[in-house]
Amino acid sequence: LGIGDEGSILGSIPHGVDTFDSTFPTRSARHGTLLTRTRGRVNIRRSENSTLHEPPCWECACRLCRHHTLSYLHHLDKAREPMMWTLATEHNLHYMGWLMRTQREKILNDEV
């Protein structure tokens, strides 16, 4: 469909689109991008992440955010460790699930 990033989804929902099939969260993860509530898109490959000993998103309850830091993820990516892509994919899918739950609540409350 080509509708998969946050902006496209949020722009489509008010027009009645309620089904999305996209590789965006997994492709973003493979390219080192984490989708977060508090920081927006985080490019784990940026050098400043090598010294940030904090989770990618404080508000996220996924395994990556509960147990790993940006500096560790940066290290995994630099080492081309497949675990980085697995954790990032899981996180991005968790984020997209959260995004859709919040939109569903807004629809039920007539806020969209």
Question: Where would I find each of the regions flagged by the language model?
Answer:
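Glycine-rich phosphate/ribose-binding loops and adjacent secondary-structure elements
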Residues: 1-56
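C-terminal extensions of enzymes
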Residues: 57-112
